Curated annotation (Swiss-Prot):
Keywords: Amino-acid biosynthesis, Aromatic amino acid biosynthesis, Lyase. Pathway: Metabolic intermediate biosynthesis; chorismate biosynthesis; chorismate from D-erythrose 4-phosphate and phosphoenolpyruvate: step 3/7. The record marks R17 as: Transition state stabilizer. Pfam families: DHquinase_II. Gene3D superfamilies: Dehydroquinase, class II (3.40.50.9100). It comes from Corynebacterium pseudotuberculosis (strain C231). InterPro entries: DHquinase_II (IPR001874), DHquinase_II_CS (IPR018509), DHquinase_II_sf (IPR036441). HAMAP family: AroQ. This is 3-dehydroquinate dehydratase. Its EC number is 4.2.1.10. Catalyzes a trans-dehydration via an enolate intermediate. The active site is at Y22, H101. It catalyses: 3-dehydroquinate = 3-dehydroshikimate + H2O.
Length: 146
């Protein structure tokens, strides 16, 4: 089983950008953590990051065509991107996706409280730090329809 893990804008800056909110763990650290956990669960993760909405959408389309579930931390696109939601709707109808946020978006600025993606996600994990990625991975493996 393959699971696509997508990280949106600015997540390449993990460990450097606002460490008081996001911690000091880098995206490379997150990828190592996920690969190790995936190996233990007997699955494969493909971890990608882009600062460009269109590239994320292209990757979602590829996952939809392959029938892969997705873990996505959309970053700021959470609150703005109808296009990303429309792409993920196809995953929603298939293998499903889990929305992950390192920080608790509901405890932050008002504009961060709304997610265009949450209503169609299998689940949302927010505020548990990078552990949220691991929890999403475990959920998708345990609840796979394949």
């Amino acid at each position: 089983m393959n699971i696509l893990v997508l990280n949106g804008p600015n997540l390449d800056r993990l460990g450097k950008r606002q460490p008081e909110i996001y911690g000091r763990t880098t995206l490379a650290d997150v990828e190592k953590l996920l690969v190790k956990r995936a190996d233990a669960l007997g699955v494969t993760v493909i971890v990608k990051q882009s600062n460009y909405e269109g590239e994320l959408i292209d990757w979602v389309h590829e996952a939809a065509d392959a029938g892969w579930p997705v873990i996505i931390n959309p970053g700021g696109l959470t609150h703005t991107s109808v296009s990303l939601r429309d792409a993920l709707a196809e995953i929603h109808d298939g293998a499903g996706f889990v929305e992950v946020h390192i920080s608790n978006i509901h405890a932050r600025e008002e504009f961060r409280h709304h997610s265009f993606l949450s209503p169609i996600a299998r689940g949302v994990i927010a505020g548990l730090g990078v552990m949220g990625y691991e929890l999403a991975l475990e959920y998708l493996v345990l609840n796979s329809h394949s």
